[in-house]
Amino acid sequence: MRSLENIFVQYDEKGKNIDVFNTIKNKNKNISDSFKILNNSDEYKPAKLLISEIMPHYMDIDGNFVEQFQTTGFDARIWELYLYCYFNEEKFIINKDYSAPDFYISKDGYNISIEASTLNNKKEYQLDIKIDDRINSILPIRFGSSIKSKIDHVDKNNLHYWEYEHTKDKPFIIAIADFSNDISMIYSSNSLINYLYGYSHEISYNKEGNLNIIPKKIENFKYNDKVVDAGFFLKKENENISAILSSTSGTLNKFLRIGKQSGFDKYNKLCIMKEAFYYDPNPNASKPIHDISEVTEKTNEKWGDGLSIYHNPNAKFPIQRHLFPNATHHFFRNGLIETVTHPYSLLSSITYISIR
């Protein structure tokens, strides 16, 4: 069983408890289905108990966390809460003196600002669209749109996120998560990496059985009447974005699994199975390692499992990799994407829940 101190590092004393589960009474706001499941179902009780333990340490700068968490912004707030836990796991000091960007973190003399963003559900996902079209067209366009909205944003003084007094001349990261479909995180990382670097990669094996990786340049992404250029990081105008951070597992199920392994299923009423795909360290491997296991109090999943940082090769203020040791890091060199990760690091996962 992991102690709470190992789940998130506590740099300050508990503040005023934010009761996110006391349902708001607002006739103009509909309570989200996701919140209802978390708040009322036995299956998600470990997640609910874990979040209740975390919230006294979380500072609601905007003052609207509870309302958004329960209504239209559930996924976005789960993503922010996940990031909070991850940055604590990496032993960053989180400075909440500023309302924007979403996070201002410090470690080893480095200061970094982060703005969070999500891809939300759209009507197009109710249509019968082929998975290849989603990966190769729709999702890159949607990632591009979400990232562009953060780049174009200015405050009342016409300043961008990286131009504030406390953020200028420091690295700036956009942390983006795909909530556009229940399982889209499993495959959307390919869409993101293709959009950012403008290359896809084909694989083949030579006669000796050695793996060959062939880069293939992508000019743009098209879907219906929308066209978006590929290679976001290759444009000098985007040099202020030091990196893009994303995770294939920054969801409610992450809180469920860590809640389970932390002892919040006291009587072991839930059977939680995790189907996962892991990085294969074999240099000739072209497919991930597949595994199915039960989540127990002996499990040791980290917040950083499944998290990737995509580094901008043209960043004005690059990110130092050693500050994020639990993340998988992606770099672009000579038309190839170089990935630095731990052996058997998590690529993606699916969670199955049943009551014993």
Q: Where is each model-derived feature located?
A:
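Short, charged/polar micro-motifs that form catalytic or ligand-binding hotspots
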Residues: 69-77, 164-169
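Interdomain/boundary linker segments immediately adjacent to catalytic/signaling cores
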Residues: 7-74
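Charge-dense, extended regions
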Residues: 263-356
